[in-house]
Amino acid sequence: MKGDAKVIEFLNAALRSELTAISQYWVHFRLQEDWGLAKMAKKSREESIEEMGHADKIIARILFLEGHPNLQKLDPLRIGEGPRETLECDLAGEHDALKLYREARDYCAEVGDIVSKNIFESLITDEEGHVDFLETQISLYDRLGPQGFALLNAAPMDAAE
């Protein structure tokens, strides 16, 4: 089914955002793991994998609309140099994604592409959950301080390899 060209553009922009998030969350997972923040690292890894699912849905929709998914472009990665900064970087990426997805959802509704609109609605719901989680973690970091936050996110000694 031939899709609206601008809808396909929005889907490719969303794909770029998701591919960027996959890489960024994965690098943060590895950094956090290296810093001994096993619980924080586990969550970043889960987020990266969730973003892979988003990318897969977007690719399938682009192909259904007879478009060409562009997996060669990424937005610049924002890589934090410490625990709080990784959270801030991820939060900035989520805010950027939400802005794009809301604009895309509205355009899809205007042109009557309800399936693409629903995909963007689903992405918005997931990204809002990510924003809430990240804002909560930043607040915890600020209230507990670096040491308290590290203790909260460290794995128990008996879980060490």
Curated annotation (Swiss-Prot):
Species name: Rhodobacter capsulatus
Positions bound to heme b: M52
Stored Gene3D superfamilies: 1.20.1260.10
Name recorded for this polypeptide: Bacterioferritin
GO annotation terms (biological process): intracellular iron ion homeostasis; iron ion transport
Any single Pfam family the record assigns to this protein: Ferritin
GO molecular function, one term: ferric iron binding
Chain residues that bind Fe cation 2: E51, E94, E127, H130
Cofactors required: heme b
Upper taxonomic lineage: Bacteria, Pseudomonadati, Pseudomonadota, Alphaproteobacteria, Rhodobacterales
